[in-house]
Amino acid sequence: MVLAELGGSISRALQQMSNATIIDEKVLNECLNEITRALLQADVQFKLVRDMTTNIKKIVNLDDLAAGHNKRRIIQQAVFNELCKILDPGKPSFTPKKGKPSIVMFVGLQGSGKTTTCTKYAYYHQKKGWKPALVCADTFRAGAFDQLKQNATKAKIPFYGSYTESDPVKIAVDGVETFKKENCDLIIVDTSGRHKQEAALFEEMRQVAEATKPDLVIFVMDSSIGQAAFDQAQAFKQSVAVGAVIVTKMDGHAKGGGALSAVAATKSPVIFIGTGEHMDEFEVFDVKPFVSRLLGMGDWSGFMDKIHEVVPMDQQPELLQKLSEGHFTLRIMYEQFQNILKMGPIGQVFSMLPGFSAELMPKGRENESQAKIKRYMTMMDSMTNEELDSSNPKLMTDSRIMRIARGSGRQVHEVMDMMEEYKRLAKIWSKMKGLKIPKKGEMSALSRNMNAQHMSKVLPPQMLKQIGGMGGLQNLMKQMGSAKDMMGGMGGMFGGGDK
């Protein structure tokens, strides 16, 4: 994912500081210098970086800290909070309401992925029960209407545009009026992409905004734009009332620091990020979990939300029961592999787990991991019900393994590798035995600590250290929020554990 290199550099700087015997002014300055260098290399604006390090030094006054304070944790928390502050201007964005027509206007640079993002935004809300519609007011780019028409047709979203009308203001007004009559409650207007220096296109954008009176103007920004991001974003903010930002191409290899700068320039929150070309590669942006994932600290709440999306409600109680019993079969492993594949790109899923930073799951390895899961599932398709439902690995004799290999078209050693993976996951699952899962909204401090103790047995030592020991794990447990009752989904999906 984009910004992965930045996250890795900051994580390493914090890790080096954590490994120091004594935390003094010299160690703190070395850590901040490394973080500063990483941010500047990632194209974050100099003033933002300077202000961030100044604020951290004000917060972390080593001379004023009492002997009992954990200096490492205070520094780590200060870095975390300052990164969150860069990405969060502190003001909420407009939220459309179902049943009441809302007009959302999209603006952005040429090539930022604006038209595709319009459709993703519409598709996301359509799945949540809105009745969206798309209006193509981009008369500048050849093929713009064709692209929007193709995307909208694929997503089954109504659209409006014209091959003959050249006035974008008229198209926008007519489209909005048409969809208001059809009782659409989310009308999305796509405008022409532009550059900062194109005065005529900016004037056109202002006219479209004045005529349609949008409830929200969204600035779409390509994460790879680099140093120019701040100036470009500011130019849009000065022309129209930008109220939110969507950052695209977050799956690329670009530095991506410009994304941080754009938020500062527009003083508007990031509401979504685009993580790929497909319609479902579009995530709601939440600052703290994002920074947590960026630094390799995981995002439990996001992970649990993913589980909520893919595990059918009728299967959830059964899964929790099996978890509390520590009973793990090949069938359960198969079902959890299915859930992982439904969650989306596997690297995205693993980045939500503490210790699985983008460096530990590099981009080239994501497809390999996904392919391995699919191979395992193919082998399990050749198993009998008795084999799938047994929790006794000794049942898998040599003759059974050879039969499964032949039936699935795989090698014997591949089936044996799969069985080793099963044993490893079964070992993790067994450690979850007896885990008490409180009902929604009933996570007391005591039960959270008990769950953290169980989790500390499951996590590999290296991962537990990276989170910040038991204290850090307890903090992560707090993040789980309303998704705590779904913690059982973790058992079969976890990629870590003792070999």
UniProtKB/Swiss-Prot annotation:
GO biological process, one term: SRP-dependent cotranslational protein targeting to membrane, translocation
Subcellular location: Cytoplasm; Endoplasmic reticulum
Enzyme Commission number(s) from the entry: 3.6.5.4
Keywords assigned by UniProt, alphabetized: Cytoplasm, Endoplasmic reticulum, GTP-binding, Hydrolase, Nucleotide-binding, Ribonucleoprotein, RNA-binding, Signal recognition particle
Annotated TM spans: none
Residue numbers spanned by region M-domain: 296-499
Function: Component of the signal recognition particle (SRP) complex, a ribonucleoprotein complex that mediates the cotranslational targeting of secretory and membrane proteins to the endoplasmic reticulum (ER). As part of the SRP complex, associates with the SRP receptor (SR) component SRPRA to target secretory proteins to the endoplasmic reticulum membrane. Binds to the signal sequence of presecretory proteins when they emerge from the ribosomes. Displays basal GTPase activity, and stimulates reciprocal GTPase activation of the SR subunit SRPRA.
Assembly and oligomerization: Component of a signal recognition particle (SRP) complex that consists of a 7SL RNA molecule of 300 nucleotides and six protein subunits: SRP72, SRP68, SRP54, SRP19, SRP14 and SRP9.
UniProt name for this protein: Signal recognition particle subunit SRP54 2
Species per Swiss-Prot/TrEMBL record: Solanum lycopersicum
